[in-house]
Amino acid sequence: MTVTAALLLVALIAPLAAALATLGWPEPAAPGHPARTGARWRRALVLAASAATAACTLALAALVQRGDTTTLSLLQLTPHTWLTLRVDAVGALYAATAAVLWLLALVYAVGYLRGPRLGRVHAALMVCLAAAIGVAYAGNLLTFFVFYELLSVLTYVLVVHDETPAALAAGLKYIVYVLFGGSLVLAGVLLTFALAGDLSFTVDGVFAAGAPANALRVAFACFALGFGVKAALMPLHGWVADAHPAAPAPCSALLSGVLVAAGGFGLVRVCFEVFGVDTLRSLGVMPWLGAAAAVTIVVAALLALQQDDLKRRLAYSTVSQMGYVTLALALLGPVATAGALVHLVHHAFLKGTLFFCAGSFAHATGRRGMASLAGLAARTPVTAAAFTLATLGMIGVPPLSGFVSKWWLGVGMLESSAPATLVLLLLGALLAAGYLLPVVFALYFAKVVTRPLEVAPKPGVAARSFEVEHRASLLAAISVAAALTLVLGVAASAAGFPLALARQAAATFFGGG
C-alpha cells in the first residue's frame, strides 16, 4: 500500500472508529461521577480522531501538489460498479478545508457544549466528518452520492441537538429539503447511467457526442436543483435561515463551511467531471444557472440586512456568498473556476470565525439580537476583534483571505468576457458591509443597555453565568480561525495553500494540467 493510500484510509477510518467508541461511554453526570471521566476521554478521543484526519488531509494536499494521486476501490456493488476513493486536487482542497474547520469546531465545542446528549452529537460529528471526507475523495458519481446523502441525513442530529420546539421544527424543515434535493440528485445519477452507462468522474465528461441534448438538459437540471438545495441556491434555500440558528454554534460553523459547501462542491464535480466544459457549452444551460446565482447574491444579502438575530443574519450571508461560487462556475472559465474553489475555502474559515464569535456573544448575553451586542467588546475584546477581522474579510478588504478569493472571482469574470457580473461582485461587497459593519459598530460603540449576565437555560441544562473569554477552548478556536483569515490572504500564493490547489484543479478541468 502506498503512503497516499494509507493516508486516505486513515482520514476516513479514524472518525468512524471514534464514532463507534464514543457511543459506548455514558452521558456526563454530576461532578465526581465516573461518567465525568468517561466524558473527558470521549472529548479527547474525538479531538484526536479529528486531528488525525486533518493531518492526513493536509499531507494528501501536499502530495497532490507534487503530482501524487491514487485510486482505492472499497466495495464492489455490481460487476461494473465500485465504491471508489480517488485523491485529486479539487478533492484534496475540500477535504483539507472540512477537516481543519471540523477540528476547530470540536475545540470550540469543548467549552461550548454542555448537558445531555453529548455522546450522540459527538458520534454524529464523527460520522459526518467521515462522510465529508468521502464526499471529497469520491472516485465516481455513485460513491459521491452515497457519502453525500450520509452527510446530509446525519446533519439532522446536529440541527436538532437542543431538542427545543424551534430546533425540532428547523430539523423537520431541513430533512424535508435535503431529502427532496437528494432525490433529485439520485434522479440525475440514474439518468447519467442510462445515457452514458458510466458513473466515472472524467475531465471530458462521460457522455458520448451523440447523446440526446434534451435528455442531458434534464439530467443537468436534476443535478443543479438537487445540489442547489444544499448550496442554498434561491429559491431552494428555505432550510438555511432556520437550521443555522437552531444548531449549536460549532455546528452552525460546520453547516455553513462544510455542508453548504458540499452542494457547491457537487456542482463542481458534475459540471466538470460528469458533463465536461464542451458539453455544457453546447447545451446552453449555464446562463440559467448564472441567473439563479445572481438573484441569490442580491436577494439573500438584502434579507440579511433585515435580520435582528445575528445567526440568521450570518445564515443569509452564507446563502449570498455561495451565490458567488455558483455564478463563477456558470462562467465556465479557468480563472473564474479557480476563484470559485478558493472562495469555497476562504468563506468556510471566515464564516466559521463569525459563527464561533456569534456563539460566544450569545453565551455571554443569553440573547442573539443586535441590542444585546451593545458595548460587548469591553467584555469580549478578543472575540470582538476576531469578529471584526472576519467581517473585513467577508467584505473583501486586503490583505485578508476574502479579498484574494474575490480578486480571483473578479479577474475570472473579466477573463470570461462577463464584465457585467463585476457589478454583482461589488454590490455583494457593499451589501456585506451593510449587514456586518453594524454588528461591529454595536460591539464597540453602541450604548450599553441592561443585559443579563446569565445564559438563558436550555431544557435539561442548568443556567450558567460565565465570561466566555475565560474558556481557553473558545478563545483558541476563535483565534486560530481568525488568524487563518489573515494567513490565507497574506500568503495566498504560497505553495501548498488553497489558491495553488484551486488553480491546479481548474487547469485540469480546462485542459491545462
Model-derived features with residue positions:
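Hydrophobic alpha-helical membrane-insertion segments
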Residues: 48-62, 179-187, 256, 390, ...
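Cytoplasmic/organellar membrane-interface segments at the starts of transmembrane helices
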Residues: 247-248, 380-382, 436-513
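Hydrophobic alpha-helical transmembrane segments of integral membrane proteins
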Residues: 11-12, 22, 231, 395, ...
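Transmembrane helix-loop-helix hairpins at membrane boundaries of multipass inner-membrane proteins
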Residues: 2-9, 17-123, 198-205, 498-511
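Alpha-helical transmembrane segments and their helix-start/interface "positive-inside/aromatic belt" motifs
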Residues: 39-50, 169-179, 253, 380-384, ...
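Short helix-coil transition/hinge motifs at the ends and kinks of transmembrane helices
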Residues: 29-36, 275-284, 452-455, 462-463
